[in-house]
Each structure stands twice: as structure tokens, then as C-alpha cells.
């Protein structure tokens, strides 16, 4: 337990250090004003959607239900519930993401008094899929935490920051500010994908059995969404 706590603290500290490096690179590449404001605005909509439907609430609602089923010896049902929650969450978030991308310009219009720059719309299109990816990642990390694995979920944000930092280093070589911003956005999406994929081998190592499932009539599935 002490070793696990030490590794978790190490990963958390490393994540903060790399995150600080990422912010330094952002300031170096784009400055603190000007073009970077378009990225900041473009990220507001996915951030709001995440905070409403895909952030910590889903994991917090899922963990007690999943743990309760495991403690009662209902392991097969626990994984069935986990698979259903993951499937329904993925489809729901994908639908929300798709609608948000379709109506990107009017949604971003609340931040502008005039016309919305096309670059801001492009940036939002690139960033919106992070909502789906982080929603799924939250479920995987919640499962690992329930199974006593804390280090890997703590390391995932480190690699997220590293991937973005690599993208920013490449952006330094780009002369066109709009292209550099798109590189930053794509690096953010790529980092989020890495954050999703990293824990999956450990999930399989814990006999994780996430599959596509639609057992929405299960009372445990309904409890998860009610608790959200």
C-alpha cells in the first residue's frame, strides 16, 4: 500500500511538472494574447459539455455500484453493467458531440460580437471528440481504481501532457499562427487518445471484460445514471 501511494504521488507530481512545461511552451509559441485566445474560446464548449455530462460525475456514480456488485460476488454482472454503462455513455456522448459540432458556429457566437472566425470553428471541431474519449477514459479509470490500481490512471495525464508538449515543439517550427494552433489542437486530441489507450492493457491484465452491451434494463445500470 505504501509503495502504491508513493508511486501515485510520484505520478501526480510528474504530471504537474510536465503540465507546467506544457504551459510554458504554449506561452512561448503563442504568447499570452492574440491567436491563443481563439484556442481558449474553442475549448470552452467541449469543457462545458464535459463538466455537465462526462467529467468526474460518471466515474463517481459508477464506482460504488461496481464495487457493490463485486463485493456480493456478482462479478459477471459487474462487468455486464460496466460494459453497458461504457456503451451507452459512448453513444450518448458521441451524439452530443456530433450535434455540438454541427451547431459549432452559433454556439461559439456567444463569445463574439461579430462573425465567428472560421479558425475558431475548426479548432472546436478538432477538440470536441475529446468529450467522448475522456468519458470512456473516466469509466476505465474508475474500474481500475475499484480494482486497486491507482498508478496507471495517475500516469495517463503525464503522457497526455507529453504528447501535447511534443506537438507544441513541432508548432515552434510552423510560421503560420493558424496552422500552429491547429497543430496544438490535434496534439491535444492525440494526447487524449493516448490517455484512453494507456490503461487498457492493465484492464485486460485484471481480467477486464469490457464489451459492447445494452443491458439497460438492469437496475444497477439505472442506478449509475441516477447517481450522476
Task: Show which residues each predicted segment covers.
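Membrane-embedded alpha-helical bundles of multi-pass transporters/translocases
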Residues: 1-228
Amino acid at each position: 500500500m505504501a509503495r502504491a501511494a508513493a508511486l501515485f504521488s510520484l505520478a501526480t507530481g510528474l504530471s504537474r511538472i510536465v503540465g507546467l512545461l506544457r504551459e510554458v511552451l504554449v506561452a512561448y509559441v503563442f504568447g499570452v494574447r492574440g491567436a491563443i485566445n481563439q484556442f481558449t474560446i474553442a475549448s470552452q464548449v467541449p469543457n462545458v459539455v464535459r463538466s455537465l455530462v462526462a467529467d468526474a460525475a460518471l466515474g463517481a456514480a459508477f464506482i460504488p455500484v461496481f464495487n457493490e456488485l463485486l463485493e456480493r460476488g456478482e462479478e459477471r454482472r459487474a462487468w455486464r453493467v460496466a460494459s453497458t454503462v461504457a456503451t451507452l455513455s459512448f453513444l450518448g456522448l458521441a451524439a452530443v458531440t456530433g450535434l455540438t459540432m454541427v451547431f459549432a458556429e452559433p454556439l461559439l457566437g456567444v463569445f463574439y460580437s461579430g462573425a465567428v472566425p472560421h479558425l475558431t470553428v475548426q479548432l472546436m471541431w478538432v477538440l470536441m471528440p475529446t468529450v467522448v474519449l475522456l468519458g470512456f477514459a473516466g469509466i476505465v479509470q474508475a474500474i481500475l481504481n475499484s480494482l486497486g490500481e491507482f498508478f496507471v490512471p495517475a500516469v495517463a495525464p503525464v503522457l497526455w501532457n507529453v504528447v501535447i508538449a511534443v506537438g507544441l515543439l513541432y508548432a515552434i517550427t510552423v510560421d503560420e499562427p493558424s496552422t500552429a494552433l491547429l497543430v496544438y489542437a490535434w496534439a491535444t486530441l492525440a494526447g487524449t487518445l493516448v490517455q484512453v489507450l494507456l490503461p487498457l492493457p492493465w484492464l485486460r491484465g485484471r481480467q477486464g471484460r469490457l464489451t459492447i452491451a445494452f443491458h439497460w434494463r438492469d437496475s444497477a445500470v439505472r442506478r449509475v445514471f441516477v447517481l450522476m
